Amino acid sequence: MFPFGQKGQKIKGTMVVMQKNVLDINSITSVGGIVDQGLGFIGSAVDALTFAATKISIQLISATKADGGKGKIGKSTNLRGKITLPTLGAGEQAYDVNFEWDSDFGIPGAFYIKNFMQNEFYLKSLILEDIPNHGTIHFVCNSWVYNSKNYKTDRIFFANNTYLPSETPAPLLKYREEELKNVRGDGTGERKEWDRIYDYDVYNDLGNPDSGDKYARPVLGGSALPYPRRERTGRGKTRKDPNSEKPSDFVYLPRDEAFGHLKSSDFLAYGIKSVSQDVLPVLTDAFDGNILSLEFDNFAEVHKLYEGGVTLPTNFLSKIAPIPVIKEIFRTDGEQFLKYPPPKVMQVDKSAWMTDEEFARETIAGLNPNVIKIIEEFPLSSKLDTQAYGDHTCIIAKEHLEPNLGGLTVEQAIQNKKLFILDHHDYLIPYLRKINANTTKTYATRTIFFLKDDGTLTPLAIELSKPHPQGEEYGPVSEVYVPASEGVEAYIWLLAKAYVVVNDACYHQIISHWLSTHAIVEPFVIATNRQLSVVHPIYKLLFPHYRDTMNINSLARKALVNADGIIEKTFLWGRYSMEMSAVIYKDWVFTDQALPNDLVKRGVAVKDPSAPHGVRLLIEDYPYASDGLEIWDAIKSWVQEYVSFYYKSDEELQKDPELQAWWKELVEVGHGDLKDKPWWQKMQTREELVEASAILIWIASALHAAVNFGQYPYGGLILNRPTISRRFMPEKGSPEYDALAKNPEKEFLKTITGKKETLIDLTVIEILSRHASDEFYLGQRDGGDYWTSDAGPLEAFKRFGKKLEEIEKKLIEKNKDETLRNRYGPAKMPYTLLYPSSEEGLTFRGIPNSISI
């Protein structure tokens, strides 16, 4: 029975959709665009119009009038004609739809939609106009809608109003609760492509024991190896290990987490998959068949990668997927060769990487700028168990340091807060013997830096330690190296720095990048979708910072961090990479991820209420920290204003069942292996919510930008950021030492990442360092001003955007100040990674909202 009284009035609606084949990878012609195919649901515009009109039905749901305790449901109506709108984006189509209305129905607050077509389509939005006594209502949908038979309950979408649970209009409350229940699922069964279910699982999908022991990997999470949780797929288990999940070509994601928009990063991500499945095997064949030489002979040959390129086998391109980003990297120009763009670190000065100043500068303005710590004791001690590992007290002595302390003693330098350390020792020692049992050969490293009067850092000494040949309990075998600038000793010192950088490169990729951003954020994505309604204010605050994260993480588990994947092949830690990240996760602290807390914990800043950001930097010219504090403050101010708009008291927050369930599940399940840690916020005050939300947004946006988009600009020159070491340091009197004296460049290259691994590494990090054409950056949102109907948050968000623009101008001015030497360095590459905005491509700047690549 039609629930309306008078049927005379109409509500006009406009629905915007995208068809499935818009996101077909074969229709993409470049990293930025699509082929115009006269896009319609099934081909021609006429077909699309008739088809859509009869196959998609919609029912409005009242937010103000109830029927049986739930909002009244209107009569089903179909899409009508296709219309043209000036606001339509690429591949988008608009249709009009009319709804009958009377005053007994009230104001619409949601709608049901059914798709009776064979194919799914992407629903962008619905706008209802001229609603009596109300005006216009916006529904921002951004969701795939499959044939209705694939769903147990009808698909529902809510208007862009924002409500705490206690403020939800009574007719919508049950719909709100039911929709949350739908996306939680029941924890059983294998997930299907059209599912929208968010649930948790451990990392039991990295290996494939059925293919042999070489491919078996331990389960991470819920065991002695703690780990954040990932999305559950429900796939079956392997034959050999009932705890490991069977590999599959299809990796389930809740449908709207994958390809939910025309985004070239989807294809950047597919590029990574192509490197793993196509490029890697073909390159391996080329090297194994001696078509390509195994080693670089000198630094000039490395430079040729960017100037002339490497000639490829004649059939190379026919064997790799026709993915635009891959085509772009394997530039043919009529010939089959591999040529990379010159990385920024060598664009001005090809040998800047060899200087001590650049080596030191990159600890505070490079790829891994959040590891360096202050030295507060001397000699440096170890936290390793002495019974198991012997005495690991650092053997760097005063005699190694004081000649270069500018007249200070070590004690005075420590007192004046002038000594810093890059410490890659304790976490590596338990795995070092296993790592060195393969073709890789390396050391645990400790590097001491001195803060000079001109504000720059300089390395004073490097300790290289390897396991004692008679056993771990005897302690390490260690040597100390100090700077040298002439003869063979200059190359010994260059090698010592290379061992440090190899450790730093591994720690960066697997800990600072993968673990501390990608893996850490995934449980937040899952918990937010399971426990916070789409109309909850905190859902709307955090949602933009999750875009594409689960998608890129699932691809990473399949091609990057999986057993025998790209990371294991091209980074020193090899098969132990993910296991080591689990060991390091044990000591991860959520509250320390707030930038001011991180800086204070590492001793590179001290709390100072009179300082602009509440902390004073001890290395005043610390580009990552000084720029980051500007961004951190802007994020926190925006979050503070937003939270205060919706929660007028701590009591309101305490009584919010969705918020409390969200935080409880995040801590106890999502990061459940650390649930008993005392540092978790209790989520009893608005201040705790502001801090937790700001930390999450910081991790997903600025922290990820700082450790990701410099990968190619710094690491694209393998000489600057080697990822593997293959030989130990040559000892005096040995043939290797003599060879180093005669041909230092060749011997250096024999020690670091080999040619095959270099080509794979560069191909991947060039993709990872790119921005997509339709990326959303911090201070921007998809949907323009329609993500909420509340004017207060909309105005606050605009102020946030303006603040970020001001910060960017300030950072640009800073980079013009030549007295700030750490911003520029010998490589003459200003620190731009925390500029909020960017164009598409390889830009060395820009803070996307989310971890999208």
Curated annotation (Swiss-Prot):
Found in maturing and developing seeds. In young seedlings it is found in cotyledons, hypocotyls, roots and primary leaves. InterPro entries: LipOase (IPR000907), LipOase_C (IPR013819), LipOase_C_sf (IPR036226), LipOase_CS (IPR020834), LipOase_Fe_BS (IPR020833), LipOase_plant (IPR001246), Lipoxy_PLAT/LH2 (IPR042057), Lipoxygenase_dom_3 (IPR027433). Keywords: Cytoplasm, Dioxygenase, Fatty acid biosynthesis, Fatty acid metabolism, Iron, Lipid biosynthesis, Lipid metabolism, Metal-binding, Oxidoreductase, Oxylipin biosynthesis. It catalyses: (9Z,12Z)-octadecadienoate + O2 = (9S)-hydroperoxy-(10E,12Z)-octadecadienoate. Residues 213-250 are annotated as: Disordered. Residues 228-250 have a biased composition (Basic and acidic residues). One of its GO terms (cellular component) is cytoplasm. Residues 162-853 form the Lipoxygenase domain. Induction: By pod removal and methyl jasmonate. Plant lipoxygenase may be involved in a number of diverse aspects of plant physiology including growth and development, pest resistance, and senescence or responses to wounding. It catalyzes the hydroperoxidation of lipids containing a cis,cis-1,4-pentadiene structure. This is Linoleate 9S-lipoxygenase-4. It comes from Glycine max.
